[in-house]
Amino acid sequence: MKAFTQHHGLVAPLDRANVDTDQIIPKQFLKSIKRTGFGPNLFDEWRYLDVGQPYQDNSKRPLNPDFVLNHERYQGASVLLARENFGCGSSREHAPWALEEYGFCAIIAPSYADIFFNNSFKNGLLPIILSEEDVDQLFKQVEASPGYQLSIDLQAQTVTRPDGKVLSFEIDAFRKHCLLNGLDDIGLTLMDAEAIAGFESRHRASQPWLFRD
């Protein structure tokens, strides 16, 4: 997993509350067991005017001109600004996969569904919680200022607006450590690789009948 320390990027505003995981990545695209290939179908039912199908050539599909991610001013956005209860619905891990592959490094919202919140951290996507008042102000500023960018500092736990105002956010210490060091579940396990190998060696020596060479 790629480490997250600091990020400065363009903000895209998704002004909808209770965005569920089926809206983030519709169910018909969940057949793949790989974690790649979901970015083109992020918010599929909102981004396109037709009904998307797995393995379809998305470059030929008609775009919805009213959807925010299709607006020219938000092309290349890497910070998603959202409303409350983002990521509600089913527990599909494909949702943070799709967001990350599209290009988002962080999400800012007043609240998240618990499972989506946890899955995001495990996949290197930083879900930041700010107050509704701060989020409201960000929506207004993004709308009024094309090219609006934010600076995120995970170590300092801050979001800095273009006007210099600093917004602080809370994060669990263990999750922060994992993001700063790029550690997912596999990475955490590999930190104990030497101890695991030692146990396996001792176990094999003490109970050799359990093993087939």
UniProtKB/Swiss-Prot annotation:
Report the EC number(s), separated by commas if there are several: 4.2.1.33
Gene3D superfamilies xref list = Aconitase, domain 4
Q: Which UniProt keywords apply?
A: Amino-acid biosynthesis, Branched-chain amino acid biosynthesis, Leucine biosynthesis, Lyase
Q: Which SUPFAM superfamilies match?
A: LeuD/IlvD-like
Q: Which reaction equations make up its catalytic activity?
A: (2R,3S)-3-isopropylmalate = (2S)-2-isopropylmalate
Q: What does this protein do?
A: Catalyzes the isomerization between 2-isopropylmalate and 3-isopropylmalate, via the formation of 2-isopropylmaleate.
Q: What is this protein called?
A: 3-isopropylmalate dehydratase small subunit
What species does this protein belong to?
Pseudomonas syringae pv. syringae (strain B728a)
